[in-house]
Amino acid sequence: MSSLVRRIISTAKAPAAIGPYSQAVLVDRTIYISGQLGMDPASGQLVPGGVVEEAKQALTNIGEILKAAGCDFTNVVKATVLLADINDFSAVNDVYKQYFQSSFPARAAYQVAALPKGGRVEIEAIAVQGPLTTASL
C-alpha cells in the first residue's frame, strides 16, 4: 500500500496562523483549510466595518489559500461558518453568495461563545484538488 502525501499549504496573501496550526493541509487531493477570521494579511488585525467586512475578508483569505493550492471556490466541498452572533446569519449568507455562486458546497453554521481576536465570523473549508464535475442524483 502506498502512503498518502501530506503537504502544508501556505501563502503570504492570507494571514499567518495565530496559533500552532497551518493555513491549510493537503492530503492526497483533499485540502483542509483552517478557520479564517476577517484578518488583514498585512496587519494581522481584524478589518473594520463589522461582520460583513469580516466575512468578505475571511472568504478572500480562503480564496488566496485555495489559489496557493491550485484551486478556487468551485473546488470547495464543505464549509463551516462560526458566528459570534447567530443574528448575523443572513448578512454573512449575502456575502457568502458572492464567493460561492453555484453548486454550493455542503455547509454548517454555528453560533459560538467567542472567536479569537474578538472576531464576529470565522470560516473553514474543505476542498478537493483537480477538475470536478457536478452531477445530480
From Swiss-Prot:
Coiled-coil residue windows: none
Gene Ontology CC annotations of this record: cytosol; mitochondrial matrix; nucleus; peroxisome
Reactions catalysed according to its record: 2-iminobutanoate + H2O = 2-oxobutanoate + NH4(+); 2-iminopropanoate + H2O = pyruvate + NH4(+)
UniProt enzyme class: hydrolase
GO molecular function annotation: 2-iminobutanoate deaminase activity; 2-iminopropanoate deaminase activity; mRNA binding; RNA endonuclease activity, producing 3'-phosphomonoesters
Entry EC number(s): 3.5.99.10, 3.1.-.-
Name of the protein in question: 2-iminobutanoate/2-iminopropanoate deaminase
Job of this protein: Catalyzes the hydrolytic deamination of enamine/imine intermediates that form during the course of normal metabolism. May facilitate the release of ammonia from these potentially toxic reactive metabolites, reducing their impact on cellular components. It may act on enamine/imine intermediates formed by several types of pyridoxal-5'-phosphate-dependent dehydratases including L-threonine dehydratase.
Keyword Lipid metabolism: yes
NCBIfam families (alphabetical): Rid family detoxifying hydrolase (TIGR00004)
PROSITE patterns on file: UPF0076 (PS01094)
Domain of life, source organism: Eukaryota
Gene field: RIDA
Known tissue expression: Expressed by various malignant neoplasms.
UniProt keywords, alphabetically: Acetylation, Cytoplasm, Hydrolase, Lipid metabolism, Mitochondrion, Nucleus, Peroxisome, Phosphoprotein, RNA-binding
Location within or outside the cell: Cytoplasm; Nucleus; Peroxisome; Mitochondrion
Modified residues annotated as Phosphoserine in this record: 136
Family annotation (InterPro entries): RidA, RidA_CS, RutC-like_sf, YjgF/YER057c/UK114
